[in-house]
C-alpha cells in the first residue's frame, strides 16, 4: 500500500486536507486551518494526516498532537498508527513508528514543564492538583483570610475557582471577567484579588500546580525567546484538534512555539 493509497478512503475535501503541503520540498508544510461541521469526518481527516506525515518520513518524535481529552488523543493516534502499520505491512516493512507526543494541552504542558523546571524556577517534582483539590486549597485560603465567615453572599469555593480559571485562561482582567460572566460577584472584586494572590502564594509554598498553572507556566516560559525557539524547534508538526475550543492561553502557546505557523494544522468547527 502506497502513501497515496492511504488516502483512498477519504472524500475529495478530506483527501485535500490530509495531503496538504506534505511531500513538497522546502521543509515543514505551511499552516493549515480545516473548518468543518459536526459529522464531516474531522477526526478521520486529522488521523489520516498524521499517518500521511509518517508515511512520508516525518520523525514520529517530532510530531505533536494536541487534543482536549486523553481519549481523543489515544483514539486519533490509534487510528493513525493502524493506517501506517497496514501500509508498512503491505510493503513488507518492519514495525510501524509510534507518535511520542500526543495528549491534552495540560498533559503536554506538564511533561514539558518537568523538563524545563530547573531553568524556569519550578521544582521538577511538583504535584498537580485536580479540580477538587484546587477547590479545597482555595477554600482553606479563603478561610484563613476570613472570607468564609460572616459573609453569606461571598462566592463559594467552586465559583471562586471558576472566576480564577476564567481570568487565567482568557487572559482578561479580573474586573472584566466579573462584569462579563459573574456580575453577581462584582462587589467582591477587591476580596477576590486578595484571595487569588494568597492562593498563588499557597501553591508556590507547597510546590503544587493546578490545571490552569500548567498552561500559564507553559505560556510564560515561552515568553523567553530562547526557550520558545528550543521548544518550537523540537516539533516539525503541531496538529490541534477541536481548535474552536482553544482559549487565549492555549492559542498564545501555539503562536509562541510556531510564530510563522510552519507545520501547524488546526481543525475546528466554527459553528460550535
Region spans (language model):
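Conserved helicase NTPase motor core
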Residues: 3, 8-35, 45, 64-65, ...
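Generic alpha-helical structural context detector
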Residues: 19, 107-110, 114, 162-166, ...
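ATP-binding Walker
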Residues: 40-41
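Walker A/P-loop NTP-binding motif
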Residues: 44-59, 79-82, 255-260
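Histidine-centered active-site/metal-ligand motif
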Residues: 48, 106, 237
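Conserved P-loop NTPase-based nucleic-acid remodeling module centered on helicase motor cores
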Residues: 60-162
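Coupling/switch/interface segments within P-loop NTPase motor domains and analogous charged loops
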Residues: 131-203
